[in-house]
Amino acid sequence: MHKIPCFVLIYEQFDIIKKCLTFLTKYAHRLHIVIIENYSVNTNQQIKPYVMDLLEKGIICKYYLFEENIANNAVHIVLEEAIAKYLDPTVFPYVFVTDGDLTIEDTNWIDEHVNIMDKHKNVFICGCSLDNSNLPTKTMPNAVHWIKPGIDQGDYIKGITGTTFTLHRTNELIEAIKFFNSKGWRYLDSNLHKFCFDAKRMIWARTKKAKCYHLTWDLYLDLTHPYTIMKLKNVNTMWKRSQSSKFQLYENSSDLRLDIYQELNDTKETIIVRKLKVISSGFDLGLDQSGIEYNGIFYPASRGFTVYTITDETVSVSNFDTHINSCTVNLARHIRESYRSGCHYIISVVHDDGFKKLSKNQLKEVGGLLSLDKIFYLYIRFSYYFVYDNIHKSLIDEDVSKVSFLSKEFSDLKFSKLISNNQITPSSTISNSNSQDLNIPDSTIIPLLSNNNGPITKQYHIVCLKWMLMFYREYIESFGSLLNIDYILLDNFNNYNYINSPEHVYIFCQLTDDSLLTKPFQKMILNTEQLTIAKYMDRTRKYINHGIQIIDYSIENIKLCNNPSTIYLPYQYSDSEIQILKKLYDSTPKKYDLVFCGSISQRRRYILDSLKSHGVSILELVTGHWGHPRDVEMASCKMLINIHYAHDYNIYESMRCDRWAFATMPVVSEDSIHYGLLDVKKHGLITFCEYDQLILKTLEALKNFKKTNENIINTVKKEREHQLIKVFTELK
């Protein structure tokens, strides 16, 4: 088994650095230790000679010495270098990254980290818990907030850490670095928090047994110590450094790359192993989107059959909507062509019903070709997948289920690859040619939340009837990962043991059972109904009268209800969601002028038919359109039109409109009862008009078509982030 690369950031304090590396080098038989040093006054006389001695003895394998102190930017630059040159996830599945002022007494700390990551695939990162015995609360009272409470999950503690021996899966670290580069960010714990929760929707874990001792905290006990003075003086700027720097790379002859490939000749075939996860949902419900996760990247499926062909790093995706189209002949032809193409693997999954227009007779030939059997048991809303090894012409797995959900992981997809030694020749000294500055935003939502006296420590549970989640899933996900939220999906609200504890708060979506109103546990109601409708206003007032706090998506609802304790939580601009929508909208050829999404009523039908009579092409997504497949269809349209269902439906439908407006799609909407309060009205993000003016306004918008202004989008985004901070303050 190969050692685990361990990147260690050090700076200035020689005694602390020596203690840390004395501890760490005891595990040199388990770790490839890579030292990253930011230049300081102690570099030349103390730190560099000590580290170079470790390098010459073969105890560490690499030493990056930067010419300036650029804080965590140095880690980001080194990780980019490592990913480009030697950090191969097929050889090194895990990577440690840590600050160089920590020690751990527990000798099993490496195994504890790895076991957590191996066992719990929903954990994005595992850091080491902190020993609080030297927490400097006497000199720095705010230090009580430095170690955040966590939730015991059995094998690990659920809760964030800093860069305290954080263990990454290498493929996910590579994905994070690519994401950071696209945003102008760098490797920093607060940015990792955002990527983990907002982009990946995963868990941050920390160890239960192993605890690291923070050596720098000993210095903080002395407010006159020069290092403490420097830290306190620069507390607001030390994490906002955006400069780059040249560096020197010193390497030992037993370099990482030589260790990886020491048995290779000039050119040799090696076997690359990849992991694959297959998900099929025969009906678009639940928390998992159908598709495949391969090499750390998720490729979503669309309705019907989605076929994936894989050749090492290349994934090709084709969709055949056998729910509404008679396209089985094309599906069969594509599978046959893939079979003959020489690709490594052929995979297909069904999403959101692939049966309605499927002809099983037309699949008999490819069924025999690939030895498929269970495909012929497919029925309405069944889930189904197959995984086929096209090199060895053998079926790896096939499954079908009437419960509408299947998920399976495959850990040993193998590929042959030629590697030449001239691609991996080590160099003794390298200068960093990447001289551009990293553009770090002044603030991001995670640092803003974290600076507000710590993150939310309570566990908030979204409680929802299974069949209702699809109505507001995107809304919840736009903020849920930032507020320590998980899901409880039920068929009956009474079929769950609610915990009566201040640390557990249950947020019921829309409604709950009346029998639970007086039960002794913490509860809230998340309302996304329109309170201009009498029955929903009555229900909301009932909950308020029982002392239950309301969270509402609409400022108009709050104005109507006039309840001071109601929390306003608007749809949030989620970078991961909007990035996907923008890409869809920008890259999809436009087939229609307008898209309408929602149930049909008489007043809606009148507007749509009138627009059609003016030559406007309209895609009507009336029922059963949810999630990614719906978004794919909507992206084929220039604009979105929003019309209220009936006269008493008089609240702006933000969950339908805002996400697409954020993705630069123009939106024309019927006005609402208090639409003057809306930020999208105030800043002109949405075009509002009265019902009688909808036809004229829509025709004008199409004639003068232009995408939504990015500056306006950013203004609304920032205002909503500030509102989220207010919510954070109230909920924590």
Curated annotation (Swiss-Prot):
Q: Can you tell which superkingdom this protein's organism belongs to?
A: Viruses
Checking SUPFAM superfamilies in the record gives: Nucleotide-diphospho-sugar transferases
List the InterPro entries: Nucleotide-diphossugar_trans
Q: Which Gene3D superfamilies match?
A: Spore Coat Polysaccharide Biosynthesis Protein SpsA, Chain A
Family designation:
Belongs to the mimivirus L137 family.
Listed name of the protein:
Uncharacterized protein L137
According to its UniProt entry, this protein's organism is Acanthamoeba polyphaga mimivirus (APMV)
